[in-house]
Amino acid sequence: MMKIYKIILGLSFILATLSIGPGCRQNYVPTDDELADYGWVLFSQGDYVGARDWFQLSIDKDSTYMDGYCGMGWSNGKLGYADTAYQYLHLGKDMTYDDIRFPNQVNLPIEFTAGLVFASSAIGNDSLTIAHSQEFDFKQTQIQVDLGNGSYRWTLKNVLFTSLEYDSKIDAQDVRLAWSMAQYNTSQFAECVSNIRIIRDDADISGVFEPDISTVQGRNEIAKELEKLQLLLSS
């Protein structure tokens, strides 16, 4: 909970600065990461407009601040502006990640890739959804190797949101579901079934899923399973 207090304390200094006249020489100047962190606090509270404003402040202060672009992407996505979300995530994804300045943001690159999966899906571009999903899968595998933990699964802003006692309910399962849907839409039925099985395994769903992908009935089974998984993961 100390992280929350630090963020709120920083906010109080910012507000105090705004109320102090220009004659004061030692106004508090919030750092870009404090601005962005408070944006994520607002995000966790469902205030996506407020979060977006704070993320915008962070990149206005430092146009190279990677997490500010990440927050802008996710906030705009939550507000239903998929095109804008994609633009910010695309702008920020190839920025240089400074793991010395921000050691707690070790998974920041994959946050961008996951966001791009959802933005592409919302836009309705199945090819982009598949491409970004494949990139996400590669990055997650690399993290598993680095951690020596093959069971690792990405969760949005896991460290920060855990400290806030907030469950975003956005994780690797949702990415794989978006990937599966894009595969279904592009008639990649075998690949879709493979991803569905992984989702089922991770969710501890019992039973065998063996639809006949060569038949209309089998493809209908896939569609129904995707609907079930969507309901399950959104609950």
Please report, for each region that a protein language model flagged, where it lies by residue.
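Alpha-helical tetratricopeptide repeat
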Residues: 29-43, 70, 114, 170-177
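Canonical positions in the second alpha-helix
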Residues: 57-58, 91-92, 136, 199
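Residue-level recognition of tetratricopeptide repeat
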Residues: 65, 99, 109, 140-143, ...
